[in-house]
A protein has these predicted regions:
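Active-site neighborhoods and metal-handling regions in enzymes and metal-associated proteins
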Residues: 1-256
Length: 256
């Protein structure tokens, strides 16, 4: 059964989403050559816990050891923070984070360049952002999950890129993951219908190369099978009668 949220519940999620947006903004500012992914994870957890009522949603979830999923270059998602993973000039780092606030969850991700990146990596980032925007715009009452997926896939395929196999968006709200799934491909008017009050994570994961993926021996990190780079952007979105409401776009003010 699909869970729908009241306007009051959506407002609570938006407050958590604002904390999440601020966390990603803070993390992006810390990204630089020489920093480890573990150091970024520590910054994220400390920043989240500095906001009353907020805590990292991913830490310990299904046994995940970090607070943030931090994935580099060909790593698509679920990279485990490590003191041995050091960012280098030209890397693409994906920062994927969830917040639990007053018992409600939000989920968001960004891709950040480490210093100067090559033109194709920049194009990958731009296309993935555009695909997310197209998916969000399709998250309207009366549409279906297939409309979101079709909108994302149209942007990605036009650029000559692919969406990662078997990795999809999902319901988020009273729990961090659930149904309906929100694939990054689809046929308009197919899949579960979007109703007012539905809250979902829309998250295109886009590869320069082929769509095939594999999981590393750590049983968490998912990478492109051909070693090509991947980008990831994600928002938590509420479907409302007034149109899609992005809950993770506007950060709370950050103290100097």
């Amino acid at each position: 059964m699909i869970s729908l949220k009241s306007p009051r519940e959506i407002d609570i999620m938006a407050r958590g989403g604002a904390i999440l947006a601020a966390t990603l903004e803070r993390l992006a500012a810390e990204v630089r050559p020489g920093i480890t992914t573990k150091a970024l994870d520590v910054v994220a957890e400390e920043f989240i816990r500095s906001h009353q009522g907020a805590k990292p949603a991913f830490k310990g979830l299904y046994g995940f050891p970090g607070s943030a999923c931090i994935s580099i270059n060909e790593e698509i998602v679920h990279g485990i923070p490590s003191p041995k993973r050091v960012l280098k000039e030209g890397d693409l780092v994906k920062l994927d984070f969830g917040v639990e606030f007053e018992r409600y969850f939000t989920d968001s991700a960004i891709t950040v360049p480490v210093g100067h990146i090559d033109a194709e990596s920049q194009r990958l980032m731009d296309v993935t952002k555009a695909a997310l925007a197209a998916g969000v715009d399709a998250a309207r009452v009366g549409n279906h999950t297939g409309d979101i997926g079709a909108a994302i896939a149209s942007v990605v395929s036009a650029a000559g890129f692919t969406t990662a196999d078997d990795l999809v968006g999902h319901y988020v709200g009273s729990k961090p993951h659930g149904d309906p799934q929100v694939p990054n491909y689809g046929i308009p008017k197919r899949g579960p219908k979007l109703l007012a009050g539905l809250t979902i994570a829309i998250e295109p994961m886009v590869n320069i190369g082929k769509s095939a993926t594999r999981t590393l021996k750590d049983k968490w990190t998912i990478v492109t099978q051909d070693g090509s780079r991947s980008a990831h952007f994600e928002h938590t979105v509420a479907v409302t009668e007034a149109g899609p409401r992005v809950l993770t776009a506007t950060p709370v003010p950050v103290a100097p």
